[in-house]
Every structure is written in structure tokens, then in C-alpha cells.
């Protein structure tokens, strides 16, 4: 009987705890008022996250941050797109020419009948008027046209998606569904900018003439951009090659601290930097490091270290933009794109003999924390590193590397293949990797 009453007493305590709203372990009971309140707050978090993703996607794809005042009003780029026949200048930019420069078209923004006509080859892709029509549909990835009531193209602006989105070519080469976060290694930013009739604002900033600016822009080539040019004015490397660097992807950044090849700052820092100083939007930006007239003479003279615009069209959007970028996963490679058996062998080499994982720490495949190294530590020259505040190179995340093999590897594409990258480290660190081990390691990298 004594055991019976002990058991009944324990049962009574259990009932009382549930009625009172707490389990025996001190946590709220499943149906307690406190749990319901927590659930409501959890739901608010989920709702907020969804809203941030939706807002961030819209900003990433379509927000110019007011930069049409630069690309349209100052550079008059829209005039070169229209061409003389439509009231602009020059021959105009046809869809064929635009696609040749790496611009992409979002098939989901094309009316179904137009998409069918494109598929059937019934759309004139050699007429700049077709490009203007695509701009009216907001179908040109990363470009927004501004039209008057008569439908005349009056200005143009750019978005994040211009450089950091591509398409899946599902309708035709360069025409398909968006792939946000992918580096557009086809995009010739320099050649597109060089089309602008009036580059006087850039020439004045750099202290050169417009023809020199065009020569610099045309030296970049596809998939490259020089984000430091308007900071230090260094257009070419000491060896005479362009100082432009490869466009990096904007996916797989959750958990990654520093962004860009040389780690200027966090992802959201770089968003503010680019929106204000590269896209030339209208916002607020503060970085006193840019006040250094020795390292950043152009930026210091232009006051880029403390930018204030009223109204501010950027700052309120940085949170959602950041959240959306962190939500973009690194895409998984197609199964047929690598050898699974070799990749499995390569994984062991990555973590073991090659010691790749010391810096490219899984699952981030970069270092948690301050993920920067000096040029001497990785066996390359320091030209590009010295153009950044910390004068170092970032340990680049490796997930999704299969998506941006075009243009080469490292910040400037100096290594044409992944095998070249591995061979560089093999020689520099004296790893002693054989040919088969290098091949296996490459297959593993392609599998990430």
C-alpha cells in the first residue's frame, strides 16, 4: 500500500504541474499559456523571415537605389541602348548584341505568346527596339528602364542582379529562369559601361580623359569588374594586365564573415559599399578607412568615406537584402558533372594530405572568424591585397564552385583550371600530391 500511495502522489504532482503550466522538468507544458505565447512569437519570427526574403528578393532583382541619376542622367547609357533611330545615339543595342555582352533575359517576365515567338525565331533580335521592349517588361536581368507617358526610354538604372544573377538558358542561350546569386561570368560590365555617350563624370573623378576611361573599361573583359578603381585609380597591374577581378558569387554566404576577394568587410558592409560607391545609388555610407589619401587617393578626394544623401534610398533596404542573400544556398552540382568515386577519394585528401581543410573549414569551406591571409601565406603577389584596407586575401568559400569555373580561379582568374590551383598549392607547400591525387581532389571540389 505504501508504494501505491507513493505512485499516486507522484501522479498528483504530475497533474498539478500540467494544470499549473509546467512539466516536471521546469519547462512550459505543451498547451500552457506561456507556450502559446512563445508559439505566437515563433510565428512572428517565421512571418518576419518570409517577409525579409520576399522584400530582399525584390530589392536584389529590381531596386536601383536611385542610381539611374548616374547611369541614365549622367552617363546617358539609355541613349546608347535606344540608338539614333529611337532618338538616342549610335546604332543602338540589339538583343543579339546585349546577349553577346552577357546580359540575360528573364523568361518568366515574358508574356507566353512572346516567349513562344522567341522560341520559334519570330522575334527580331537584331533590332534595338526589341531591347527597349524587353526593358519595358523588366525582363532584362539587372537593368531597369524608366519611361515617360509616351513610352519613350528616359533613363536607366542597374541592380545587384546585373552581376550576381544569371539564367538557366531554358528558352535559349541567355534567356531563361533566374539563378540569383550566381556570378555572371559572361557579363562584360566594362564594355557595357563604355557604350555610354558621356563618361565625363568618371573621367573627372579619375583625372583623365574619356577615351582613357573607355580603354580601361574595355580592358576588363567578360566576368570582371574593378571595384577598387574609383578608390585608388589603379587601372592596371604592374605587369600591364587589367586590375579588374572576377565577379564572385553571392550564394552560400550564411556563416561567412568577410566578403569579396580581399575581405573589405562583411556581406552587408559590401552591399552598402557597392550600392553607394559602385552602383552610385543615393544612400548613406561611412568608412573612415577611405579617407587615407595614400592608399585611396580618389576616394579620399571625393569624400567617399562619409556619404550622406537625403532622401536615403539604400539604408532601409540593407537588412532585407542581406537576409535574402544569406538565404540563397550554394547550388548542388549535377550528378554527371563529377566522378563520385574519385570525389570520395578527394575528400580524404582534402582533409588529410593536402591540408585544404585547415583554411577551407567544412561545412563553411572558409575559416570561421577573420578569414584573411597575407599574399606570402598563399604564394601569390600582393597587388590586389594591397588595394584593400587590411592588405590581405580572403579564404574564398568553395561550395558551388562548379557554377563559376568560367574565367578561371583566384581573384583575377590567373589559374585557368582547378587542377592549376591544386598544382600551385602542391608546389608552394610541398604537399607531394601525385597526379591521381590531384585529379581526385579536383573531382571533390567539383562535387561541393
Predicted ranges, named:
Residues 2-14, 18-448:
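Periplasmic c-type cytochrome electron-transfer domains
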Amino acid at each position: 500500500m505504501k508504494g501505491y500511495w507513493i505512485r499516486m502522489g507522484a501522479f498528483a504532482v504530475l497533474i498539478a504541474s500540467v494544470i499549473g503550466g509546467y512539466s516536471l522538468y521546469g519547462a512550459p507544458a505543451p498547451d500552457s499559456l506561456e507556450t502559446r505565447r512563445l508559439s505566437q512569437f515563433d510565428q512572428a519570427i517565421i512571418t518576419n523571415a518570409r517577409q525579409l526574403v520576399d522584400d530582399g528578393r525584390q530589392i536584389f532583382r529590381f531596386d536601383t537605389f536611385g542610381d539611374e541619376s548616374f547611369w541614365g542622367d549622367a552617363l546617358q547609357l539609355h541613349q546608347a541602348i535606344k540608338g539614333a533611330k529611337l532618338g538616342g545615339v549610335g546604332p543602338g543595342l540589339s538583343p543579339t548584341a546585349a546577349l553577346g555582352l552577357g546580359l540575360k533575359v528573364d523568361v518568366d517576365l515574358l508574356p507566353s505568346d512572346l516567349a513562344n515567338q522567341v522560341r520559334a525565331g519570330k522575334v527580331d533580335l537584331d533590332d534595338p527596339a526589341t531591347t527597349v521592349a524587353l526593358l519595358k517588361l523588366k525582363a532584362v536581368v539587372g537593368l531597369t528602364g524608366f519611361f515617360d507617358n509616351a513610352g519613350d526610354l528616359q533613363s536607366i538604372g542597374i541592380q545587384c542582379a546585373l552581376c550576381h544573377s544569371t539564367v538557366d538558358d531554358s528558352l535559349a542561350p541567355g534567356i531563361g529562369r533566374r539563378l540569383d546569386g550566381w556570378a555572371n561570368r559572361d557579363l562584360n560590365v566594362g564594355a557595357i559601361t563604355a557604350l555610354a555617350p558621356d563618361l565625363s563624370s568618371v573621367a573627372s573623378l579619375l583625372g583623365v580623359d574619356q577615351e582613357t576611361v573607355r580603354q580601361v573599361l574595355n580592358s576588363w573583359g567578360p566576368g570582371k569588374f574593378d571595384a577598387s578603381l574609383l578608390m585608388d585609380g589603379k587601372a592596371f597591374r604592374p605587369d600591364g594586365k587589367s586590375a579588374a577581378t572576377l565577379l564572385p558569387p553571392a550564394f552560400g554566404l550564411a556563416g561567412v564573415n568577410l566578403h569579396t576577394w580581399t575581405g573589405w568587410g562583411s556581406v552587408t558592409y559590401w552591399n552598402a559599399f557597392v550600392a553607394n560607391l559602385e552602383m552610385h545609388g543615393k544612400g548613406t555610407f561611412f568608412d573612415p578607412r577611405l579617407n587615407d589619401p595614400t592608399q585611396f587617393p580618389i576616394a579620399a578626394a571625393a569624400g567617399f568615406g562619409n556619404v550622406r544623401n537625403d532622401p536615403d534610398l539604400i539604408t532601409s533596404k540593407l537588412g532585407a537584402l542581406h537576409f535574402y542573400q544569406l538565404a540563397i544556398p550554394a547550388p548542388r552540382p549535377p550528378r554527371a558533372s563529377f566522378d563520385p568515386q574519385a570525389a570520395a577519394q578527394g575528400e580524404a585528401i582534402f582533409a588529410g594530405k593536402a591540408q585544404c581543410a585547415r583554411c577551407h573549414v567544412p561545412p563553411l569551406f572558409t575559416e570561421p572568424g577573420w578569414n584573411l591571409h597575407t599574399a606570402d601565406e598563399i604564394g601569390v603577389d600582393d597587388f590586389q591585397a594591397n588595394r584593400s584596407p587590411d592588405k590581405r586575401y580572403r579564404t574564398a568559400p568553395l561550395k558551388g564552385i562548379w557554377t563559376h569555373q568560367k574565367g578561371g580561379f583566384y581573384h583575377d582568374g590567373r589559374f585557368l583550371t582547378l587542377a592549376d590551383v591544386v598544382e600551385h598549392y602542391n608546389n608552394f607547400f610541398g604537399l607531394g600530391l601525385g597526379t591521381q591525387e590531384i585529379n581526385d581532389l579536383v573531382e571533390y571540389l567539383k562535387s561541393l
